[in-house]
Structures are given as structure tokens and as C-alpha cells.
């Protein structure tokens, strides 16, 4: 499956937002002008978009945050719409339960792309078995751990150091950094998830 491998700043400028594609220790610098679109002479972002444009931009932003392509994202929406409860919240929960995202939330990788690579390289176990599919959905109660080989990766050590420095902790995961493992305790509530995502716009887009 194709993945974007270009500059993360370009994507951030396209969406006008920090997509968490860089390590917290390497925040977007002054060269990444979020108010301007990509390109040598990117036009300053317009203050007002049409309803459709706003819905489309929100979908693109969320896709890029979680590293999901269009077809897969649409399938997530279809799945979310068949579940009980709020479709938008269901969609975010499906994205949050992806294995690469769980690895990122637990602090074993500084970005989701780094977490995806860790999973793809067979460095992650779920309930004692290696899982190399980033889109694998983790369930409440699952134990996620790094393989002995992955525990020695410098990028993992650096990520855990950054996690400790920034104090990033999420209530729906419990992590034992010394054992390089964690428990996915429960599905996150909407209040626990990023407030800068407006999932209602995505629901409106796909409901047309």
C-alpha cells in the first residue's frame, strides 16, 4: 500500500495544523509556516472555506494524522456508521485502536510513522504473539509489548525518554516502561481525544 514519504512540513502546511508527524523534541520550526499552503510562493490561507471544502479538509487532516489512505478510511467510516452510538466518536475510536497508534500512545515511538515501521518490522507482540500489521485493532485488555530485539532500538529508548520528559500519559493505556509493555485498558472517551478534530464535519461529508 502506497504511503507518503515526503516532507511532513508540507502536509502540515496543506492542512494548516500540526499533524504530530514530528517528534515532540523537534517541533515544527519557523520555516514551516502553517498559515501558507505548500509551494515556493504558497498563497496565504483564506479565512473562509465553503462547507464542502471544510468537510474535505477535516477528512484529509484526520487521514494524515493517523496515516490512513482513502479506501481504508472510508471502510472505517462504514464500520463506524453500523455501530451503536455516535458515528464520529466510533470513527475516532477505530482509528485509536490501530496497533501503530497504540504503540505511539504508549510512548514506544515518537510518531505514528515510526510506530508503523516498528510494527511492520515485527518488533511488536500482542498477547505474546508477533503482529506485523499496523492496522490490527487492539481490544480492551490486550497486552502490547516490544520484542527483545526492538527493546534495544535506539529510537525506542529515545522515545521513552521523551515520554518521561513530556509526561505524556493517556488514561486508556497503562505502560510499564521497564518491561517495554503496556495494557490497552479501554476504548478512549471523546473527551480524552484531541479537541482540534471536528469529526462531525467528516460525518457530514460521508452522509451526502
From Swiss-Prot:
GO terms for cellular component: small ribosomal subunit. It comes from the Bacteria. Pfam families: Ribosomal_S4, S4. GO terms for molecular function: rRNA binding; structural constituent of ribosome. PROSITE patterns: RIBOSOMAL_S4 (PS00632), S4 (PS50889). One of the primary rRNA binding proteins, it binds directly to 16S rRNA where it nucleates assembly of the body of the 30S subunit. This is Small ribosomal subunit protein uS4.
Amino acid at each position: 500500500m502506497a504511503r507518503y514519504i515526503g516532507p511532513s512540513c508540507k502536509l502540515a502546511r496543506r492542512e494548516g495544523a500540526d499533524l504530530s508527524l514530528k517528534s515532540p523534541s523537534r517541533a515544527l520550526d519557523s520555516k514551516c509556516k502553517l498559515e501558507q499552503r505548500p509551494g515556493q510562493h504558497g498563497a496565504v490561507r483564506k479565512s473562509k472555506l465553503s462547507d464542502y471544502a471544510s468537510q474535505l479538509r477535516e477528512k484529509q487532516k484526520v487521514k494524515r494524522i493517523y496515516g490512513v489512505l482513502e479506501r481504508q478510511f472510508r471502510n472505517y467510516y462504514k464500520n463506524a456508521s453500523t455501530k451503536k452510538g455516535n458515528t464520529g466518536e466510533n470513527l475516532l475510536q477505530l482509528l485509536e485502536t490501530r496497533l501503530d497508534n497504540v504503540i505511539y500512545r504508549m510512548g514506544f515511538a515518537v510518531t505514528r510513522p515510526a510506530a508503523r515501521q516498528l510494527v511492520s518490522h515485527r518488533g511488536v507482540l500482542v498477547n505474546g504473539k508477533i503482529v506485523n500489521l499496523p492496522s490490527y485493532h487492539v481490544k480492551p485488555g490486550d497486552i502490547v509489548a516490544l520484542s527483545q530485539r526492538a527493546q534495544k532500538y535506539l529510537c525506542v529508548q529515545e522515545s521513552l525518554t521523551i515520554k518521561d520528559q513530556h509526561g505524556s500519559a493517556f488514561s486508556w493505556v497503562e505502560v510499564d516502561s521497564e518491561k517495554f509493555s503496556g495494557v490497552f485498558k479501554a476504548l478512549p472517551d471523546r473527551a480524552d481525544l484531541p479537541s482540534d478534530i471536528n469529526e462531525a464535519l467528516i460525518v457530514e461529508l460521508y452522509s451526502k
